[in-house]
């Protein structure tokens, strides 16, 4: 297949502003190319991709991330929108005769409701759960137009859009390039928190866990909302939490791999949680709230622990049981199900079905 990948409009690839969708897109570009497909990426100006990747960089104003808006807040399309400009370029490319399908990564209504403007099929890989009334309507529009055209990363994510939508979408999970992650058998005692520094990611809960366990917590990710960090630091003055910034995959995996555990204390429905499989690939157990995709990834008692949502004491209690986890089992789970090749294979099969 000759595939056009439409990137997220919230930031350039490589900036970290797009969150997990950036890793997903990079992984699929490599994986699909390895399977013999031709991939062209359409992304905002300033995007960085792997060498030999064909990319069209498009200018325009970036969009506000959907997770920062209230559910009923109408989205604001900025003047000279980068998404509008990227979509215009995608529709032009679709008429060239050089492509077979569009793979949309943008969590925005435009590609979902305007897919008929393209001369080739459009497939949508939804990166987040239900966050707004408009996106719910947009996803429903696409699903009812073509029941095969929407895929999601987890069953929990699909259920967030309601049972009818959940029954009509394809679940493809996710994957990573295992060669980029070193397995580390002997960790130190620190905990890791890897996420955008924002309210829905549970920054306050992370500080609370650091206080309860008395362990050092290293936080990695884009500083999206400094006030959330400052509020948590004031509330938990005895927490030893070190902000390590947004790191490249190579540096992050080395730092993450030394951790005793990754904690995932999110307050929203994580669509999947790529960082969970990144941690597991390094041999790091994952302690997660039973909310969203991460709870489907973690094998409770084998690769980590799944605890009740919003229960920081349960997270701290799970830290005390980390000695029961064999780190090699964590790596094995990723090798079996979440490799780049396995993920690309699932997505390629789905795209072939959409294109029929």
Q: Where does each model-flagged region fall?
A:
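Catalytic cores of nucleotide-sugar-dependent glycosyltransferases that transfer UDP/GDP/TDP-activated
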Residues: 1-356
């Amino acid at each position: 297949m000759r595939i056009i990948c439409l990137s997220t409009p919230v930031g350039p690839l490589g900036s970290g502003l797009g969150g997990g969708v950036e890793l997903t897109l990079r992984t699929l570009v490599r994986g699909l190319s390895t399977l013999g497909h031709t991939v062209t990426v359409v992304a905002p100006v300033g995007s960085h991709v792997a060498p030999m990747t064909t990319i069209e960089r498009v200018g325009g104003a970036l969009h506000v991330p959907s997770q920062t808006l209230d559910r009923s807040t109408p989205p604001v399309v900025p003047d000279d929108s980068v998404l509008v400009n990227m979509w215009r370029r995608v529709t032009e490319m679709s008429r060239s005769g050089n492509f077979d399908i569009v793979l949309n990564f943008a969590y925005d209504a435009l590609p979902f409701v305007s897919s008929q403007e393209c001369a080739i099929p459009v497939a949508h890989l939804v990166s987040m759960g239900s966050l707004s009334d408009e996106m719910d309507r947009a996803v429903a529009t696409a699903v009812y137009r073509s029941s095969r055209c929407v895929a999601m990363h987890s069953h929990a994510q699909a259920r967030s859009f309601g049972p009818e939508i959940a029954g009509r979408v394809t679940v493809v999970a996710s994957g990573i390039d295992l060669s980029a992650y070193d397995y580390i058998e002997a960790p130190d005692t620190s905990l890791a928190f890897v996420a955008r520094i924002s309210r829905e990611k549970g920054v306050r809960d992370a500080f609370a866990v650091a206080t309860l366990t008395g362990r050092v917590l290293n936080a990695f990710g884009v500083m999206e909302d400094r006030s959330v960090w400052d509020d948590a630091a004031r509330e938990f003055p005895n927490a030893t939490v070190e902000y390590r910034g947004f790191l490249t995959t190579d540096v992050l995996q080395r730092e993450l791999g030394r951790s005793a555990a990754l904690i995932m204390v999110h307050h929203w429905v994580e669509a999947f949680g790529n960082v969970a499989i990144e941690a597991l690939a390094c041999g790091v157990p994952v302690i997660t709230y039973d909310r969203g995709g991460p709870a489907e990834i973690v094998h409770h008692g084998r690769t980590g622990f799944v605890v009740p949502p919003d229960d920081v004491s349960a997270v701290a209690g799970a830290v005390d049981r980390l000695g029961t986890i064999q780190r090699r089992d964590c790596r094995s789970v990723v090798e079996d199900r979440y490799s780049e090749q396995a993920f690309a294979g699932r997505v390629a099969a789905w795209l072939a079905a959409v294109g029929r």
